[in-house]
Every structure is written in structure tokens, then in C-alpha cells.
């Protein structure tokens, strides 16, 4: 008989309720379990009488454990209130956990998350009404905006489709019950942007009709768009399902107009079209997962941490399971996760030092070699035995470092990055808990990677057939090692997160400081060899190696110098590996985290440049990308580009840009009222004074002004929403919607430079000067760094404007 597959669990008043799958059937099981937390006994004794007077009916028992009092509850729902009682009097320990989390933490039975059946879904809704959003950005559908259809495809490719039969409550209730019934047959459900749209929409409609959906508490919901962003970890102009499907699958969504009742009209008049459109969306998500397998990665990570799949969405949650379990094994009781006031207090300490990213040598380069730290932060943690219980203190005076370079201690190197980050001291006589966890994750990953090499290639290096070649096993092993890698890299985040029980500013800063100092040490050694270090990105370096050296020689050298480096700081467990990773055929380096490169396969990649940003208008992005591609392909033609600038100028000033090229997109981070106040001078930290002697007020961006006008006109606009707009006048800026622009004429309220309220008469023109500068800014950035200065083309701006554009080349951002 197969072991049960644990789907999800939930706290009950006197235990835990578990949903599990066994032999193809779902079951629930109620288990008795008393939740508990700890108080230092020295704090418990003087407050015991008051506490027991209020909570004696809910406390099962108390017991003393190594200076702590363990309080067990016979009513798990009183744990939160009991915590508040103690928080007013003293520090609590592990008092934040609900019973189901504590139960998983205390147990060791296998969960088998990798065997959970999963389902992809997509809903279509009545789009005749404007959508509203709550403070968290979740959709709030209008009470009359029904769900029209729901398409679902499971992990085996089975398709399901339910539709609204009639536009009435009875039909929608049936549809909702069908959706809920199918959801209940799976352990994981996922859709694209479902955290903000599909799931809150469905729950809102269920609430409206008073339909019980407790079953969803026992189903893991994963937003696949969030998974894609998390695990793919690349910047893109758009994360729409259509954009990602085109990129990953070279497939598109089925054409279908949306908004202003278009979906509703299709439901009324062409139900087959709506069905095709709806099902295709779910099938696209399935196909993306077949390639990327992010559901499977999430399941494997849940196994690593012994938690539910939904707990892997946030690294801090799965990381808590990983770390707290080992602290428990070591007999160490940890603090509770902080409450709001403590989080705010922690954040006052300021930002923890970040990674070392630099651009030392901007320009165009060929044959660029990249060296990269293997698991940089995990390796630093293990090398310097960084953990809460091993931390001794901080050394602010470097003259005092020597006294700690002994057999008992290891010292982390200091570093200067905008400000001084001091050395820290850790005991090395006993391995820390965090290094134990990190070592386990890294070592397990290394074992799998070794096996992967055996199964990866069909042919051996000598051309003979590889009898161990197994692409299916290779993919399985790849997912397993990727899960371990993600978990290993997430540990630092738990220490640096102000909301975490593991947060410690000194410890987190010692990790990033050690990493920066070590990377800079490697830079210096490369430069001492005569290599040209162009710059780097957190854990890597872009280098032109000196003629006469080989990659292997430099790899061997790094083994030697990193051992010397860690010996100097008295580490007895060096795990630092700085090794050759890859080579760029060509590279255009503009500034840190802003570059383009062509790999040895001829593929071009863009990092950080405006061509990849959603806020860049499409024409500017297209032009910058074309320029970079010409440069990287070594087909750059300066005459072509000099003429191109003239052509673009004529295109823009002849009013020939189309609405798509004109449309700008920016997120609405705050409303107009939040822009009140004055511009602060960075040098004086006082309000900036204009030439006429008046104080310079903060200007309100065009998309914010547009949002304010639309709200006044009765439109539903929420903070966090993406605003699509076209600028028809600048200084002061006036923006309208693409739909308003397409009408060709219009009258809009406007406040001119003299603060007069006037009516602006729109006659179909956009502001040519505004768009010209927006197009030039990204182009000037790449042209400037390729040429080592700005080419003397006719840029069609004044000398002052050109000077400003060149000055802002390092800050170009739409």
C-alpha cells in the first residue's frame, strides 16, 4: 500500500486537520496536538500568577527546559492572545507559529509533495464594469460582474471547461460549484496572475452567494506568474501570459478583444470562440510548466524544508522551516517572529550592505571571460562559521583584529563600500547551525550535479556512445539540484529580513561584507597578473585575461589565493570557489548592471538597459536594441546611425508616431495628494530654492495627473495599477489615455506655468519635443559608451539640452 501524500494542513482548536491523498482518494484526518511556545523561566515566574489567572482554562501544562518555560495549550486558538499577554512583559520564543506549522516542524514523516496532482485554470469575467482593487492590489469585482467561464487543464493534459448558461444568479451558482468541485480533486491549483485576479474574484463571488469554500484551505494555490518571476529571475518589459508564451513557447494567446464588454459580447454571441480562448490560456501555462517545471521545483523545495508547497512561495517561509528544524535538533530555542513595532524599529537601523557591483571599464569589448563564485553567500556563511550562536562581536578598530586571529575564533574581513563595514568575530570551535543547514543543501546539490554529468550527454568526449545517457533522469536531477540551490541561496534572506526571527543586522552585514571584500581581493589578484578587470556583478567579474594565461591556470591560481585569504582570517573550513563560468564573444558595458552581450552561441542578451524596461516606450526600446545588436554583431555602421537619427527626428516631428509607439506605461505608486511638499537639495538637505527665490515644489508626474483626472470623472483607479498614457504637452506635463488620443480631438482641464486653470484643446498632436528627448536618452547612453564620447551627429536639441542628456546617461530611466 502506498504512503499517504500530504496535501495541506490547518490548525484546529485542539490539534491539526490534515488533508491527504492515498490510493487515488482524498481523506481528512484530525490529529490531537497541543501547540506551545517558550518564555524564559526568569520572566515566567514573576508573571505566572497573572498569566494563569487569565489562561488557566487553556493551558494544558507548563514545563521547564534549560532556563525556559514551555507553555502548552489545550486550546490552540488562544496561543495568539497568550503571546500578546507575554509580549507586554518580556520577550517570547517561537510564539508566532500556528499549530499546523509546529506539527510539521516536530514531525519527520515524508510528505511526498512531488506526487501532489496539480491543475491549471483561467477564468473569463463580465468586463462591462470597471474593476476596483483593495489596498493589497487584489481585484474587487462589481456585484453584477459574473464569472462567464472557467477553463482548466491538469498535469496529465486533461481539459475541463465550464460556462455560465444564463446571465442570472442561479446559473452562476452552478458554475461556481462546478469550479469548486474540480478544485477539490487536486492538491495544487495554479493560474497566471491568480493571486491578484482569478482567486480573489472567485472567492468574492462565492462570498456573494454564501457558498462555503473551506476546501480551498486544504489546496495549495500557486500564482504561476509569481513562480515564473521568482525562478526565472530575469527582467522583462512584460510578464503577461502572452509575452512569456511567445518567448518560451513561440506560441500566442488566441486573439480576443477585452474590456468595454467585449468578453461579455463574445460569451453572448460566440461561445465557441470564448471556449477556445479560455482553454488556450490554461494550456499555455501547462506548456510553460512542461518546459520550466516550476511546480515541480516548488514541490521538491517543500520536501527539503518539510513544509507544504504553498510555503515555498516566500523564501522566508520555507527558510524558517529549514533553519528552525536544525535549531531544534541542536536544542536551541529561537525568538518569535517580530510584531509590527519591532519590525519598524529594526528598519530604522538602515540598509544592510549589498553586493559589489561595478563598471570599471565601460565600452565595447571582445572575448570577455567571466569568473563566478560558486554559491557565494552560502560559501561565505560556511567558511566563516556565521551563525547567531557563534557570533562573538564586532571589531570597529582594525588594530584589534589580530588578537582574535586564534584557534578559537574566525574573523570576517572588513570592507569599505560607501561607508566602513567592520570585521566581525565568530567562534569556530563548534560548527554553527546555519552553516550546518547550508552545508547540507550545498553538498546534496553537488552530489546531484555529479550524477547529472553522467546522464547529460548522448556521446562521450571521445565520440563514443554514453551508455548512461538518460535525458529524463537528467531533467529530474536538474530540478532536484535547482531546488537545493534555491534553498541554499534563500538562507541569507532569512537573516537580512527585518520580519524574520533570524534577523540580525550585524550578522547579515558580515555576510555581504565578507563577500564584497573577497571579490575585491580576487579583482586585485587578476589585475596584478596584468589582466583587465572590466567590472562585475555581486559574485562575478568580467575580465580580459592577459595573453599567455589560460583559464585553467587562473582557476588553479584562485584555489591557491583563496586558501591563503581564508587562512589569513583563521578559517579552518574554506568553501570559497571562484571559477571560470562562461565567455562573452562581445560585450557593450555601459555601467554597473547595464550591459549587453553576445555569447559564444551567437545569442544576444540585454541586462538592465532601457530596452528591457516596461516603462520605456516601444520605439525607444526598439532603437536602443537595434543599436546594441549591431554593435555586438560587429556590424555597426556610424553613417547608418547618423542618418537614422535624422530619420527618427523627421518621424517624430512630422507627427508620424503611432499610438503604440507613443504609449508609455508606469505604475501608479502614489496619488497626486502624496506629492505635496518641496524638492530637497541633496547638498544642504533643505528645500531647493529656484532662481526667482521661491521654494521649488515637487512636480506631479503626468501619469499621476491623468489618474487624478480619471478618478474625478468616476473611473476606478487604484494605487499599484499600471497607467497607459500619451503625452500631448510638456512643461507642465499633460497626459491622456491612448483611447482619448485615438479620438483625435478633445478638451482637457490644464494648469499652465502661471498656475492658471485653463482648457487645453487637443487636436490630434503629441508633444514632439518630449518624445524626441525620450527616444534620445536610451540611444545616447549606448552610443556614448560605445564611442567613448558622444558622436558629432545632428542630435536636433540645443547645446544645453544635449549636455543635460549626456550628463544623465548614467541615470537614464523612463
Regions inferred by a protein language model and the residue ranges of each:
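Catalytic nucleotidyl-transfer cores of nucleotide-processing enzymes
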Residues: 199, 211-214, 224, 230-231, ...
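Active-site palm subdomain of RNA-directed nucleic acid polymerases
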Residues: 253, 518-538, 543
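A glycine-rich phosphate-binding loop feature that marks nucleotide/adenosyl-phosphate handling sites
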Residues: 300-312, 396-400, 462-464, 505, ...
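Catalytic palm subdomain of template-directed nucleic-acid polymerases
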Residues: 541-560
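Metal-dependent phosphoesterase core characteristic of DEDDh/y 3'-5' exonuclease domains
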Residues: 145-156, 189-190, 194-275, 280-283, ...
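C-terminal, non-catalytic extensions of nucleic-acid polymerases
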Residues: 555, 559-814
Amino acid at each position: 500500500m502506498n504512503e499517504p501524500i500530504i496535501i495541506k494542513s490547518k490548525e484546529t482548536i485542539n490539534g491539526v486537520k490534515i488533508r491527504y491523498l492515498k490510493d487515488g482518494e482524498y481523506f481528512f484526518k484530525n490529529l490531537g496536538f497541543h501547540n506551545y511556545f517558550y518564555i524564559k523561566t526568569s520572566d515566567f515566574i514573576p508573571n505566572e500568577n497573572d498569566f494563569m489567572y487569565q489562561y488557566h482554562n487553556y493551558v494544558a501544562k507548563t514545563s521547564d527546559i534549560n532556563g525556559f518555560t514551555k507553555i502548552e495549550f489545550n486550546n490552540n486558538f488562544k496561543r495568539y492572545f497568550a503571546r500578546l499577554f507575554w509580549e507586554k512583559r518580556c520577550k517570547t520564543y517561537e510564539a508566532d507559529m500556528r499549530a499546523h506549522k509546529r506539527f510539521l516542524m516536530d514531525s519527520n514523516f515524508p510528505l511526498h509533495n512531488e506526487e501532489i496532482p496539480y491543475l491549471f485554470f483561467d477564468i473569463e469575467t463580465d468586463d462591462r464594469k470597471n474593476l476596483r482593487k483593495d489596498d493589497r492590489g487584489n481585484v474587487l469585482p462589481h456585484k453584477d460582474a459574473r464569472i462567464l467561464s472557467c477553463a482548466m487543464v491538469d498535469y496529465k493534459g486533461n481539459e475541463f471547461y465550464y460556462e455560465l448558461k444564463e446571465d442570472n444568479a442561479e446559473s452562476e451558482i452552478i458554475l461556481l460549484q462546478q469550479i469548486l468541485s474540480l478544485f477539490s480533486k487536486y492538491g495544487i491549483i495554479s493560474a497566471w496572475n491568480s493571486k491578484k485576479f482569478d482567486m480573489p474574484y472567485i472567492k468574492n463571488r462565492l462570498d456573494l452567494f454564501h457558498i462555503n469554500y473551506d476546501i480551498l484551505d486544504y489546496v495549495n494555490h500557486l500564482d504561476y506568474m509569481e513562480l515564473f518571476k521568482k525562478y526565472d529571475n530575469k527582467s522583462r518589459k512584460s510578464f503577461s501570459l502572452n509575452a512569456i508564451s511567445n518567448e518560451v513557447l513561440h506560441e500566442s494567446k488566441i486573439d480576443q478583444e477585452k474590456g468595454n464588454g467585449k468578453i461579455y459580447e463574445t460569451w453572448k454571441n460566440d461561445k465557441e470562440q470564448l471556449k477556445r480562448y479560455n482553454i488556450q490560456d490554461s494550456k499555455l501555462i501547462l506548456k510553460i510548466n512542461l518546459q520550466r517545471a516550476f511546480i515541480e521545483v516548488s514541490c521538491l523545495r517543500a520536501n527539503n524544508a518539510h513544509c507544504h508547497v504553498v510555503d515555498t512561495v516566500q523564501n522566508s517561509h520555507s527558510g524558517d522551516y529549514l533553519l528552525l528544524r536544525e535549531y531544534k535538533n541542536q536544542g536551541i530555542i529561537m525568538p518569535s517572529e517580530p510584531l509590527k513595532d519591532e519590525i519598524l524599529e529594526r528598519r530604522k537601523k538602515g540598509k544592510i550592505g549589498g553586493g559589489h557591483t561595478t563598471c570599471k571599464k565601460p565600452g565595447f569589448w571582445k572575448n570577455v571571460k567571466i569568473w563566478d563564485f560558486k554559491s557565494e553567500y552560502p560559501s561565505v556563511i560556511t567558511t566563516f562559521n556565521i551563525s547567531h550562536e557563534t557570533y562573538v562581536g564586532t571589531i570597529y578598530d582594525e588594530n584589534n583584529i589580530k588578537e582574535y586571529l586564534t584557534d578559537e575564533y574566525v574573523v570576517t574581513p572588513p570592507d569599505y563600500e560607501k561607508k566602513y563595514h567592520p570585521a566581525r568575530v565568530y567562534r569556530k570551535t563548534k560548527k554553527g547551525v546555519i552553516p550546518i543547514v547550508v552545508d547540507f543543501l550545498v553538498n546534496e546539490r553537488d552530489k546531484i550535479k555529479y550524477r547529472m554529468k553522467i546522464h547529460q550527454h548522448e556521446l562521450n568526449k571521445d565520440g563514443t556512445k554514453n551508455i548512461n545517457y538518460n535525458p529524463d533522469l537528467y531533467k529530474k536531477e536538474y530540478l532536484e539540484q535547482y531546488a537545493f540551490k534555491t534553498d541554499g541561496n534563500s538562507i541569507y534572506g532569512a537573516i537580512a529580513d527585518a520580519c524574520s526571527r533570524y534577523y540580525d543586522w550585524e550578522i547579515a552585514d558580515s555576510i555581504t561584507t565578507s563577500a564584497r571584500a573577497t571579490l575585491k581581493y580576487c579583482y586585485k589578484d587578476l589585475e596584478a597578473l596584468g589582466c583587465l578587470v572590466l567590472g562585475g556583478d555581486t559574485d562575478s567579474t568580467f575580465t580580459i585575461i592577459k595573453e599567455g594565461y589560460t583559464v585553467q591556470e587562473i582557476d588553479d591560481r584562485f584555489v591557491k589565493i583563496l586558501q591563503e585569504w581564508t587562512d589569513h582570517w583563521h578559517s579552518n573550513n574554506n568553501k570559497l570557489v571562484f571559477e571560470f563560468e562562461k565567455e562573452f564573444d562581445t560585450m557593450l558595458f555601459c555601467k554597473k548592471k547595464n550591459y549587453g552581450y553576445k555569447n559564444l552561441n551567437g545569442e544576444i542578451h540585454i541586462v538592465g538597459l532601457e530596452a528591457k524596461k516596461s516603462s520605456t516606450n516601444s520605439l525607444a526600446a526598439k532603437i536602443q536594441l537595434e543599436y546594441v545588436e549591431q554593435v555586438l554583431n560587429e556590424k555597426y555602421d556610424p553613417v547608418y546611425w547618423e542618418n537614422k537619427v535624422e530619420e527618427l527626428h523627421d518621424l517624430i516631428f512630422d507627427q508620424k508616431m503611432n499610438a503604440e509607439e507613443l504609449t508609455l506605461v508606469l505604475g501608479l505608486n502614489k496619488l497626486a495628494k502624496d506629492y505635496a511638499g518641496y524638492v530637497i537639495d541633496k547638498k544642504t538637505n533643505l528645500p531647493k530654492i529656484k532662481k526667482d527665490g521661491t521654494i521649488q515644489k515637487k512636480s506631479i508626474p503626468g501619469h499621476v495627473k491623468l489618474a487624478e483626472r480619471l478618478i474625478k470623472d468616476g473611473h476606478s483607479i487604484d494605487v499599484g495599477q499600471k497607467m497607459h498614457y500619451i503625452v500631448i504637452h510638456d512643461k507642465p506635463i499633460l497626459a491622456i489615455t491612448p483611447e482619448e488620443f485615438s479620438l483625435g480631438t478633445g478638451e482637457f482641464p490644464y494648469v499652465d506655468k502661471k498656475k492658471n486653470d485653463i482648457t487645453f484643446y487637443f487636436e490630434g498632436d503629441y508633444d514632439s519635443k518630449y518624445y524626441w528627448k525620450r527616444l534620445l536618452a536610451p540611444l545616447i547612453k549606448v552610443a556614448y559608451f560605445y564611442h567613448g564620447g558622444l558622436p558629432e551627429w545632428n542630435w536636433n536639441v540645443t547645446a544645453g539640452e544635449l549636455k543635460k542628456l549626456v550628463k544623465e546617461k548614467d541615470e537614464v530611466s523612463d
